[in-house]
């Protein structure tokens, strides 16, 4: 089963690398859209690799605990950005909205970073196994909030191109 999981992650990372490289010569899109797409692909890649690394590190020697904590911190901090990047790629957002969302994402990342030291959102035990902390629902809320934002952006994009029957 682990080989299948590893192959799935490897294929996902490979696909994201192809998408990142395809942006380099794309002059048909605006610079900001290319930047958002690049951020989306890079974030998905980093999160996938961190998630895979965290799974692989479960139960490894205790000397790897700091690395395990760092990997989970990166993963949990960046994952909510996926929905934000994807939403902004699907339908343009006003700068104010983007700045507010990035501030919320930064606050979430700060909470995850604090959790690396306190264990409130997640912790790694003495046997180097990852566990959810008492405030893990905050991460779930942030991730689901970014997915709701993405769905709302899809709705706005559909509305923008909807034919109303007028002239």
Where are the predicted features?
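Hydrophobic alpha-helical transmembrane segments of multi-pass membrane proteins
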Residues: 5-28, 32-62, 68-86, 101-119
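Transmembrane helix-loop junctions in multipass membrane proteins, especially transporters and channels
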Residues: 27-28, 56-63, 91-96, 116-124, ...
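Cytoplasmic juxtamembrane regions at transmembrane-helix boundaries
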Residues: 99-106, 163-167
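Alpha-helical transmembrane segments in multipass membrane proteins, preferentially the mid-helix core
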Residues: 16-23, 84-89, 140-165
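Short juxtamembrane and helix-loop transition motifs at transmembrane-helix boundaries
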Residues: 1-3, 62-70, 130-135, 155-166
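Extracellular-loop-to-transmembrane junctions of the mid-late helices
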Residues: 2-11, 110-156
């Amino acid at each position: 089963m682990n080989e299948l999981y590893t192959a799935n992650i490897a294929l996902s990372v490979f696909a994201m690398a192809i998408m990142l490289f395809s942006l380099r010569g794309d002059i048909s899109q605006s610079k900001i859209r290319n930047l958002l797409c690049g951020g989306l692909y890079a974030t998905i890649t980093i999160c996938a690799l961190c998630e895979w690394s965290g799974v692989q590190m479960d139960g490894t020697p205790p000397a790897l605990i700091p690395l395990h904590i760092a990997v989970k911190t990166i993963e949990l901090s960046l994952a909510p950005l996926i929905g934000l990047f994807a939403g902004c790629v699907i339908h343009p957002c006003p700068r104010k909205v983007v700045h507010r969302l990035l501030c919320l994402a930064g606050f979430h990342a700060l909470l995850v970073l604090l959790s690396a030291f306190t264990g409130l959102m997640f912790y790694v035990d003495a046997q180097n196994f990852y566990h959810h902390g008492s405030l893990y629902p905050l991460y779930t809320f942030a991730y689901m909030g970014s997915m709701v934002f993405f769905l709302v952006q899809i709705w706005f994009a559909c509305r923008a191109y909807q034919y109303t029957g007028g002239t």
